[in-house]
Amino acid sequence: MEEVGLKRILQKLFQHKEIKPLCCVAIEAGPDRKREYGVAGKADYQGLGNRANFYSSFVLQELLPFLYKTYNNLTFTQISIAGFSLGGLSALDIAWKHPGVFEIAGIFSGSLWWRSVDMLDKTYSDDKHRIMHQQIRKGNFQPGLKFFFQCGNMDETEDRNNNGIIDSIDDTLDLIMELEAKGYDKNKDICYYEMPAGRHDMQTWGKAFPVFLKWAFGDKLKG
């Protein structure tokens, strides 16, 4: 997280009393992340994400218990999970499936295009084959769960439906619509942050991260 500038971001926000005290843990993205990240139990059409269930189990059964044990003198009132790109897809999937553990999901340039059928296949349909959208559609409203989505207008150049909007933004806005259809309030439960010059890189996510932290953990001490 050095490229994102996490330490500097946290120090500045704490100094200005813009966020509550928090414990922030970063998981290293390993060389097998294309298999470890994704939607647990549902690999994409290439077989990627086929180890997402193991990654989810690591977070829930190893990492969180370790943190509770290590910081047993602290009381955690709110737990969030966030990620960039494929990590954002994983964060959303894990939070969605474990709402009793996580209250907030942060998705930065999320790989919400994750699909069960190749888009070049003539049978492909956005409505049927985007995996995370289907997970939301088939799931249930979970009270208390909140979502932060960030996209950049320069995340990519692909526009598979030729509507003049890049796919990453289309996929994100469509997923937000799925959440709204479940009963989530777009003003109270969802934050969508679109960056005009945002790219698919650490520098962009570093600029977006303070926005997420203030939205998720904003403090009332200032002023």
Please provide the spans of the model-predicted regions.
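Non-catalytic cap/lid and distal C-terminal segments of serine-dependent acyl enzymes
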Residues: 1-223
